[in-house]
From Swiss-Prot, chains A, D:
It holds the Pfam family NAD_binding_1. This is Dihydroorotate dehydrogenase B (NAD(+)), electron transfer subunit. The gene is pyrK. Heterotetramer of 2 PyrK and 2 PyrD type B subunits. Binds 1 [2Fe-2S] cluster per subunit. Binds 1 FAD per subunit. GO terms for molecular function: 2 iron, 2 sulfur cluster binding; electron transfer activity; flavin adenine dinucleotide binding; metal ion binding; oxidoreductase activity. Residues 3-103 form the FAD-binding FR-type domain. Keywords: 2Fe-2S, Electron transport, FAD, Flavoprotein, Iron, Iron-sulfur, Metal-binding, Pyrimidine biosynthesis, Transport. Belongs to the PyrK family.
Curated annotation (Swiss-Prot), chains B, C:
The active site is at residue 130. This is Dihydroorotate dehydrogenase B (NAD(+)), catalytic subunit. The gene is pyrD. Catalyzes the conversion of dihydroorotate to orotate with NAD(+) as electron acceptor. The keyword rRNA processing does not apply. It comes from Shouchella clausii (strain KSM-K16). It is an enzyme of class 1 (oxidoreductase). Keywords: Cytoplasm, Flavoprotein, FMN, NAD, Oxidoreductase, Pyrimidine biosynthesis.
Length: 259, 304, 304, 259
């Protein structure tokens, strides 16, 4: 029986962009984490008014220090409460969960395009680090709503070229990540992406036949495959066919499931 | 661990704790967290005749101390359950309560007949109360005569004892329970979820794609306790109690209300170790209450 | 503040916010905390024909995100309310919704006839749903025909508009609401409390002296929203929405579900400034949703 | 409109006996507090699973520092959570509420007996301080379950004679406060008491005709008189007569209400 739950201690919590927090947790459970694109199912606190955990992606891992980093937007009740927690507090974490990005798809020397939108950017950072370790060549295209929302530009720069787009044009290129890809004529051997559904749809339309992998979001109950909350339809599948985002995903090859 | 044992029709339980139907899949997921043999029993996800996708997503929403779900009985269908899911329990020594649902009486009968003959199925839990199925389902659970008729038909074909799972969305739960007892049910399971909804103030739309969903979790515990308290004084068949159970203390409340054993639903999502933790803590509660066995507590709030 | 105004039968409200009956006494207590003239209206505690002590204590119990109460309609009786309580509102400019209850139809009629003639009473709220009164009360609220008859009788004698307050402890809330509308009610108030209980694991006894009590607070909000969503699409009279409202965002949810105004009950106990805080925050929500007036939101989850 | 709600800051929180905590709060609201026997209606924290406030008596006031002290037993869910809160945290407090002990009943030079049981002891401390200031002569009889539960013996000693009783005899005199009063033949001009109902009943039986005042407990909703949760019957009153413990009490002359 592999241990999948633990209490991790907050060692750092900082606002890295408007309402976006970088949370570093430390503890033994981190030993079990290594796959980029997997997520943690985080209990907000011990009080009993918010019963559901929050799924948040792994943004980085430091195996030596047994530390895991997440970056999340404090938008609703739960994440706001999480953001108010101080260093030293313990957080109840389930994970690592799900199927992450397939690292082995990008061979040494291949061109990889990381395409992230908003709060979908975090898992791409750890993915990029691992890909660079493996000898892939990484270009990142990161889209945000506006300048105040941009984070992690510098860390991504250490992995390779970075293009930033903002919807309101207040920073980087104006428009969406797909605009940047077109304008810069960016090409790739493998593409990995995480972000809002419209972005994933646009990428799917363009790259249905390519080696491309996307990470999806859905409201979750259990996070472990038991409750059937997080299913999606399969493209060209039978009416009752499905994939569970929590256990079959959150990462799928482009075109496998209906967005 | 004899102190925790309870023997109910079809269910020889090491302890009174089982995961609730729909909150534990078909067992394998939580089997990664602890040894399922610790459990008193397992109620598996509802089986319908045909495979079902269920409702569109979002299917769950959070509420204060509770959650809404509108899964819509997704399951691989009768044959899928028999072929893919049930065989896995060969490796375990724990009674299985197979929850069944349908939209017509014939569906129920067919599923009950076949599922009840499978090895690994110890008893049937007749879900006449799922609020998320549009046709049929809900009416079965709110009209005593229809509930009774369905019970009778399913009893007639079932090879194992039948527990009927009641809907709390009724004015007179006792009338329904009595009708079902009279129709030959071996036990009752209560309660299923309360019908509720959430609206997203920003988008102005219902949060669930299905609009309405079933409310579960700590929020509904007082309603569950009241209904079990009312019903257990009026029927002689055992009750599987559920609705918001999170701790061993909650379990004691349900036993005192009149439940003979209990099921844990939503709390599995908050903490996958809820069931084993309760099983670990129950003996301390027996010591504290100075009783030898959990059976000494059943109905203790009214029969002493 | 015109953006918050709403005009309902008998109730010209500056804003859609009133304290709920039984959770605000007869007004004077919370008048120590803020100026009652800020409120859209005030629903006062139920009045019965004779003075009542109500149930024995303990009368309240805490539950997760909710509470149980079994006050049992304590009040100084019709004459007491008229002589001691109502005159105090002379100093205020806020419509009063007078909640009335009884154990027989005659009681209701007598109280409605006399109370509705008092200055300071703008409308009657017919409480057919209090779960804590042993005789009569509960049945009125669960059977459409009886609810309709009572409504008709009270309408016949009342000098002011009549709102009927529905019980959520029913299988088909729409059937009851429609019967009451047909009987001539000017509006509906929903929901009253869900019947629940708590058991003290240590003493093994129900926590409330009355055993059962009414569940209120955030826990029941999803049930309230669902019922208002169902009913508002089927009736043409306005609905006073309530059940777990704590914030302006909650109010928006209720308006979108189909309520025309709302009442705040339990949240007053958690924070006596809940009503004024909501009134303060509502305009920000209108800005955010880019609507001019709260009336633009009523039923917005289904009528757009 | 008198201000009755405020956010006070925890300046001290210490365990003074088994599961019993002394909590010192500081803030502007303390200005409005002066009457011994009044209580504060305390919100446990900002989470929304425990909606009801907890009524806790004022145990001491330092008007200069704007500090109020409460002593409470961490027994149930709410008080346990309160006990876990650290210095610096803000606590939402309603109060002062209710009618406290009538100070003016004890004239200069009169003999006062303070009789406290368990977690009913705290309000008597501030009462005693105020009585001593007024020139009354104070004797305290304090009962606890056992030695581990005893608190505030020293502070009470500064007010006058102190007799401690423990039910299990592990400290002070064995037995109940009433046993001590009998054995020591303690007499008084005025008696003030707070503690468990059986104790108050015993005192009522003995001193029904005397100048004696008792403080009662009941489960509360609003704490301000609006919800009718906390009523009690009136001795020899009509069937529907009542007193509200939150606004007419918690202190009543002995014999006024039915225990
Ligand atoms: C696999 C996966 C990985 C994710 N990784 C990240 C990440 O790295 N950083 C980040 O900021 N966000 C991430 N999200 C989204 C994140 O889960 C939600 O933003 C968060 O749950 C919202 O909680 P709340 O308390 O702010 O909102 P509330 O409105 O209080 O949430 C209420 C309920 O709805 C659920 N919910 C609301 N929005 C979403 C959403 N977009 N996706 C899933 N559930 C939702 C909540 O989990 C909760 O159960 C991820 C989601 C998934 C499924
Ligand atoms: C006027 C007054 C003054 C009090 N002063 C003190 C004091 O100085 N120190 C102290 O330790 N205790 C005092 N109490 C008792 C204190 O209010 C309870 O111990 C406390 O509310 C229990 O809360 P909990 O979270 O531990 O228990 P829980 O079991 O979680 O409480 C659940 C609900 O029941 C209520 N409740 C439970 N027990 C009591 C009780 N004995 N009295 C009233 N309500 C109760 C709670 O307030 C809450 O609403 C006082 C009570 C009253 C009425
Ligand atoms: C996600 C989810 C799925 C459920 N699916 C079923 C089901 O298939 N059949 C059934 O009888 N009950 C189903 N239920 C109801 C539970 O078995 C249980 O009766 C209810 O949730 C109350 O218990 P709880 O508060 O502990 O969750 C489901 C509940 C949830 C939360
Ligand atoms: C202590 C208490 C007393 C109540 N008394 C009455 C009453 O006298 N008449 C009535 O119609 N409803 C009464 N109610 C019900 C409320 O008016 C309201 O319908 C219900 O509490 C749901 O709203 P909430 O969740 O905001 O409290 C009472 C509720 C509480 C908590
Ligand atoms: S969240 Fe429960 S199955 Fe995916
Ligand atoms: S607690 Fe509400 S009236 Fe006393």
């Amino acid at each position: 029986m592999r241990k999948k739950q633990g209490r991790l201690t907050i060692v750092k919590q900082t606002e890295v962009a408007r309402d976006s927090y970088e949370l570093v947790l430390e503890g033994e459970l981190v030993k079990h984490m290594s796959q980029p694109g997997q997520f943690l199912h985080v209990r907000v606190d011990e009080s009993e008014d918010l019963l559901l955990r929050r799924p948040i992606s792994i943004a980085n891992i430091d195996p030596e220090k047994e530390q895991v980093t997440m970056i999340y937007r404090a938008g609703g009740a739960g994440t706001k409460r999480l953001a108010a927690q101080r260093v030293g507090t313990e957080v109840d974490v389930l994970g690592p969960l799900g199927q992450g990005f397939p690292l082995e798809e990008a061979k040494r020397g291949e061109e990889v395009l990381l395409v992230g939108g908003g709060i979908g950017v975090p898992p791409l950072y750890y993915l990029g680090r691992r890909l660079v370790e493996n000898g892939a060549r990484v270009t990142s295209v990161l889209g945000f709503a506006s300048q105040a929302d941009v984070f992690y530009e510098q860390p991504f720069k250490q992995l390779g070229n970075v293009h930033i787009a903002t919807a309101d044009g207040s920073y980087g290129a104006p428009g969406f990540v797909t605009d940047v890809i077109s304008q810069q004529s960016l090409d790739f051997d493998v593409l990995y992406s995480c972000g809002p559904t419209p972005m994933l749809k646009a990428l799917t339309a363009r790259y249905r036949e390519r080696r491309a992998f996307i990470s999806l979001e859905e409201r979750m109950g259990c996070g472990v495959g038991a409750c059937f909350a997080c299913v999606c339809h399969v493209e060209n599948g039978q009416a009752h066919e499905y994939r569970k985002i929590c256990t079959d995903g959150p990462v799928f090859p482009v075109g496998e499931v209906v967005l | 661990m004899e102190r925790l044992q309870i023997s109910l029709p079809g269910l020889e339980m090491k302890n009174p704790v089982m995961p609730a139907s729909g909150c534990f899949g078909f067992g394998k997921e939580y089997g990664q967290f602890f040894d399922l043999n610790q459990l008193g029993a397992i109620a598996i996800k509802a089986t319908t005749k045909e495979a079902r996708f269920g409702n569109e997503t979002p299917r769950v929403a959070e509420t204060k101390a509770g959650m809404l779900n509108a899964i819509g009985l997704q399951n691989p269908g009768l044959q899928g359950v028999i072929e893919q899911e049930l065989p896995r329990f060969d490796d375990y020594d724990v009674p299985i309560l197979a929850n069944i649902a349908g939209s017509t009486m014939d569906d129920y009968i067919e599923v009950a007949a076949e599922l009840s003959q499978q090895r690994n199925v110890s008893a049937i839990e007749l879900n006449i109360s799922c609020p998320n199925v549009k046709q049929g389902g809900i009416a079965f659970g709110t009209v005593p005569e229809i509930a009774a008729e369905l019970t009778k038909e399913v009893k007639a074909v079932s090879a194992v004892p039948v527990y009927v799972k009641l809907s709390p969305n009724v004015a007179d739960i006792v009338a329904i329970a009595k009708a079902i007892e009279k129709a030959g049910a071996d036990g009752l399971a209560m309660i299923n979820t309360l019908l509720g909804m959430r609206i997203d103030a920003k988008t102005r739309r219902p949060v669930l794609a299905n609009q309405y969903g079933g409310l579960s979790g700590a929020a509904i515990k007082p309603v569950a306790l009241r209904m079990i308290h009312q019903v257990s004084q009026q029927v002689d068949i055992p009750i599987i109690g559920m609705g918001g159970i999170q701790t061993a203390e909650d379990v004691i409340e349900f036993l005192l209300a009149g439940a003979s054993c209990i099921a844990v639903g939503t709390a599995n999502f908050t903490d996958p170790y809820t069931c084993p933790n309760i099983i670990r803590d129950l003996p301390h509660w027996l010591d504290r209450l100075e009783v030898q066995s959990i059976t000494d507590l059943i109905g203790g709030s009214w029969n002493e």
